[in-house]
Swiss-Prot record:
CDD domains the UniProt entry points to: YihA_EngB (cd01876)
Residues that coordinate or bind Mg(2+): 37, 59
A GO MF label: GTP binding
Organism name: Halalkalibacterium halodurans (strain ATCC BAA-125 / DSM 18197 / FERM 7344 / JCM 9153 / C-125) (Bacillus halodurans)
Role played: Necessary for normal cell division and for the maintenance of normal septation.
Gene Ontology cellular component list: cytosol
Entry binding sites for GTP: 30-37, 57-61, 75-78, 142-145, 174-176
GO biological process, one term: division septum assembly
Name of the protein in question: Probable GTP-binding protein EngB
Keyword DNA damage: no
Pfam families linked: MMR_HSR1
Record domain EngB-type G: where: 22-194
């Protein structure tokens, strides 16, 4: 998909701050520092619309990005980051849970997982939670540029096995560096919102 418009529409922590818009939404979930912001930037061909950071826990709000006036990407705070207070982690958890459970415009969650490693316990909990609430999931196996192409199938199989992946949930191999998987990711996203 050719992106001609991409802008941060809204930053929210409470439902009353969500954008008053009928646009379908696709949320990005993943552990802290897995590359959610880099994914957004690569998908829209922009270097810095979504702020990236070497410091885990940078995203602390729900960030709604309007893409071509046809959908919102919703960047949510990363999970599994230990260096914030328990109180902050609980507040983030409630904020994310409220959004994922109550937002009618939400059509799918892109669960970003580092292809180099087996999914973490937090990845597994998030996937199970999304499946419990019957939220469609597109798994983005990112950072594929960091391992030889010949090893991709083995790593994808590991991800599917550890998550006990539902047959209907696609896994897209992706790289924010090279753009591998970008077209496949757009195809899966557009299918989810149609």
């Amino acid at each position: 998909m050719k992106v001609t418009k991409a802008e941060l529409d809204c930053v929210a922590v409470k439902p009353e701050q969500y954008p008053n818009s009928p646009l379908p939404e696709v949320a990005l979930a993943g552990r802290s520092n897995v590359g959610k912001s880099s994914f957004i930037n690569k998908m829209i061909n922009r270097k810095k619309l979504a702020r990236t950071s070497q410091r885990p826990g940078k995203t602390q709000t729900l960030n709604f990005y309007n893409i071509n006036d046809i959908l919102h990407f919703v960047d949510v705070p990363g999970y599994g980051f230990a260096k914030v207070s328990k109180k902050d982690r609980e507040a983030w958890g409630r904020m994310i849970e409220t959004y994922l459970q109550q937002r009618g415009q939400l059509k799918a969650v892109l669960q970003i997982i580092d292809i180099r490693h087996d999914p973490t316990k937090d990845d597994q909990l998030m996937y199970d939670w999304l499946k419990h609430f019957e939220i469609p999931v597109i798994i983005i196996a990112t950072k594929c540029d960091k391992i030889p192409k010949g090893k991709w199938p083995k790593h994808v199989k590991n991800i599917a096995s550890v998550l006990e992946k539902d047959g209907g949930d696609p896994i897209v191999i992706f790289s924010s560096e090279t753009g591998v998987g970008k077209d496949e990711a757009w195809k899966a996203i557009l299918h989810a919102i149609s």
